[in-house]
Amino acid sequence: MKQVFFFAIMLLTITSGCQQFTGSGNIITQDRKTDPFKGIAAGGAFEVEINSGSSNKVTVECDDNLMPYIKTKVVNGVLKISTSERAGFANAHMKVFVTAPEIDFIDASGAATIKANNQLKSDDKIKLESSGAATIKASVDAPQIFTEASGASTIELSGRTRQYTAKASGSADLKTTDLQSENTEVTASGASSAHVHSSVSLVATASGAANVNYRGAGALQKKTSGAANINPE
């Protein structure tokens, strides 16, 4: 019931005061010129696919009558994917194909879905953030991985790292058991759920009605409050 109320409020917020457009059904593609970027931020109802390549490239696929309202702009090294202000869409097809040599930051909000078709690699760190009803799915390989999921969003990861720092709140879900981490620090609150792995050490904190489930032989330090649980899978 709470999630239904949440999505109803979100829909009213998005559509209130907006000019509404219905997708024509005639799907076209358009290559966009772009400055170099290593991060991606997408909101709304976009589907974003990330592919590895030698240079940055952005291709938008959508209904022909919606193309003028799809915005792609690089700000401080982050590709911002959005729609025009005060424009709402119904029955819309909105996909963005992104190619980049390296991506080390992803921010998905609203009802956006961001999927990496190739493993994301960095010599330093990778940070992933999700909110609203957004979803991020990726395989990652970096010394440090940071995730933060809120609202009713989901982050699903595989790969490997030496240090994994994770936060989940609201009714968010972190599906990261397949991320082979040496040292993991996870904090879960609200009604969120976090699934993690550690081979060396695990520091877990859960509050409210949150759940933390873990795999691996890492030495465990845990703290719970309320109706929260921290258990092995």
Where do the model's predicted regions map?
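Extended, compositionally simple hydrophobic/Ser/Thr-rich segments
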Residues: 38-50, 96-98, 103-233
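Short acidic/polar N-terminal linker immediately downstream of export determinants
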Residues: 4-12, 16-67, 78-99, 114-119, ...
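Solvent-exposed adhesion/ligand-recognition segments of exported proteins
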Residues: 70-74
